[in-house]
Amino acid sequence: MAAPVQTIDVLLAEHADLERALADPELHSRPDEARKAGRRFARLARIVATYRKLVAAREDLETAHELAATDESFVAEAAELEARVAELDSQLTDMLAPRDPHDADDIVLEVKSGEGGEESALFAADLARMYIRYAERHGWTVTVLGETTSDLGGYRDATLAIASKGDTADGVWSRMKFEGGVHRVQRVPVTESQGRVHTSAAGVLVYPEPEEVGEVQIDESDLRIDVYRSSGKGGQGVNTTDSAVRITHLPTGIVVTCQNERSQLQNKIRAMQVLGARLQAIAEERAMADASADRASQIRTVDRSERIRTYNFPENRVTDHRIGYKSHNLDQVLDGDLDALFDALAAADKQARLQQS
């Protein structure tokens, strides 16, 4: 393991440098920089801790082998330590493997109703609530940037910004990046008088929001900016002035809305940040053709034929069609209990990456 050891030497030095930097009050006068350093330190701390455990286990194994040469009672202990060393070695190798560069990032998530009329809008609202509950379970913050509601209180569309708190090694993107695509629901709609099960669909688009948006140039002449009076669920006013902002990026057709900041200027600034993140994601997809299918085609059309997951109410079943995952706890899933599903998706993604490498 010569190469990983060399890598570890570099990471140990970086870990020590960050530890000193984070102890300096001067750094914390720059909150964004301190947060970025804290996240990096948290990830390195896991690697360093595993490496130190591996070093200690190897030393114990060497001692056990020496003792076993003259005392058979140490043979079993040596075997246990060999298994421990192999386990830690595997963990460290996994930690040192190339990672998605956005794993520590926050996200912007869009939910859009599709076919199914009012029922689709109600299902889109169920999905938005599911993600909000999941974020709450993890102590993350959720901001509703914009929403268009239906007559029965569903979502025609909604845009959420989800951000982790504190210094975490893995951010929101690492857990929620597989949610983009078409979600299908099978249930009896509230508008159905005959008790028949209907199928509807809603689409989800999710993309990372890096702390620093790269070299994305946005020409003001490519933008159409509209100002309007926003309204939230149930028609209640969110703003007392026409402060909501809708920005359309004409070359791509991307539309970003923001209505929940305190002023029109703040809404425009936030909408531009989201637009920049969206355009950066598109640029990265084009630069990485092999990976582009993962996100670029998340919502080509919100149609039942392009589904990633089905929520079947009569059978209390959730099925993720990409990995064949099934569970019969639909009510818990819709209440934000998504970790088992997300773990399965991450494991499948990891296996696919290993097969491609």
UniProtKB/Swiss-Prot annotation:
InterPro entries: PCRF, Pep_chain_release_fac_I, Pep_chain_release_fac_I_sf, Prokaryotic/Mito_RF, RF-1. Pfam families: PCRF, RF-1. It comes from the Bacteria. GO terms for molecular function: translation release factor activity, codon specific. The modification N5-methylglutamine is found at Q236. Peptide chain release factor 1 directs the termination of translation in response to the peptide chain termination codons UAG and UAA. This is Peptide chain release factor 1. It comes from Mycobacterium ulcerans (strain Agy99). The gene is prfA.
